[in-house]
């Protein structure tokens, strides 16, 4: 009897454990099946820093979506910049692929979206740095993106204000980090005490145990030069998509940052047999919605000796992309750099100077409505050599600007600004500069019109009989009124504001409203000047078609 009871006990024990094993197997199988079907893809922490919430597409319409994410969002005064990350294998999307979606900040889900708008534009060709520009969100609303193809909403990333932000950074060839920052409101044209600030590197600046700190070498305007920690330099290729850099005023908090130092600037290319750089003469410019004027500006300057153009695009919404592509197809050496930052022209010019330094002997910093004019017919390169031969230490030519008026016109001249506008003010206004980027002061201080130079270098004023700038400043009203939108320079007051109304940057007598005066077409006309017009018609006009190259 005892043996029988023992056998029954063993049988029940075996039954219990077999049943339990079967149930657990079913549970694990079910969980595994549902996890494969519904679990969202985890964005790799290598690509997505720990400080940022994982922001993948959330949709019930399709289980197989690429893990597109919003890295961060920056609120500008008139629009929103949304920085989008893609998987490396994904194609770049276009403006037509996205909708900007707006939802109440009290919403608990993106499904409660209350408003959709098309993006203003989409910029960038890098899967880690594409920018979708959305219309500004209404008060009380947040903004995110929807991928139209599958109805997928993308969770919003961290949001920052544009006026208190570290927005760009690059590691220079001397291994320092050049950082571009808004929020300190430093005065123009002045170097500040670097010991009051420090540089901060890390994934999450809120976790002070996991950040690196380094000394500020110099700080002026919106440009900070930092001593880069060795651990950042030694692991640069591994961490440059994750590590951020920021600046802290000692005793205060660390500024928000979206700036990743990125790949170190390339060292200068191998020089030629005589030590020349690839290009003798280059131009940097910053523009917004100037696509229709760009062909004339590039083609003309190419003929007088400019070899390379750096275009900094400040949130254009015209067809600037296609214009630049057509110029590239025509063998012009031109590149577009997206520079979305508001009132940051000085910083943009400094950024451009660093990029051009290894490629260009001389760089001119002018606008698209400004044209170098050589009254004697010299080539620009020859004129620069002529004007800078007073010593090896000349590193900047300051070129006087003549301001042209509407010249009696009421519509945009069909043959271009150089032919259409022929009447100007008698005396020059201000100047613009051609500089040797190698000779710039390490602070990169500039006031748009000229730079600070290193010790031992000097500037000269160009002879107005040899080299001047025709500035087509006061064009027909439909073009000129765009200047009221916003001035791009950091230290220049927007024209709608009452401050500094008497500035030379403004048009005399216009006030703060974009209202066309009845006599606008006849203003700013003191001297007839057809010098550049005559040269254009003589050297550029096709005798068979009577067309200029930029009209084709």
From Swiss-Prot:
Locate the coiled-coil region(s) and give their ranges: none
> For this protein, what is any one GO molecular function term?
glycosyltransferase activity
Q: Which family does it belong to?
A: Belongs to the glycosyltransferase 92 family.
| Keyword terms of this UniProt record | Glycosyltransferase, Membrane, Signal-anchor, Transferase, Transmembrane, Transmembrane helix
Tell me its EC number(s), please.
2.4.1.-
Q: Which domain of life is it from?
A: Eukaryota
Per UniProt, what is the membrane topology?
Single-pass membrane protein
Q: Which residues form the GT92 domain?
A: 277-520
User: Could you identify this protein by its name?
Assistant: Glycosyltransferase family 92 protein RCOM_0530710
Task: List membrane-spanning regions.
Answer: 12-34
Write out the annotated subcellular location. Answer: Membrane
InterPro entries referenced in this protein's UniProt entry, alphabetically: Glyco_transf_92 (IPR008166)
Q: Give the CC-aspect GO terms.
A: cytoplasm; membrane
Judged by the first EC level, this protein's enzyme class is transferase
Database matches in Pfam families: Glyco_transf_92 (PF01697)
GO process annotations (BP): glycosylation
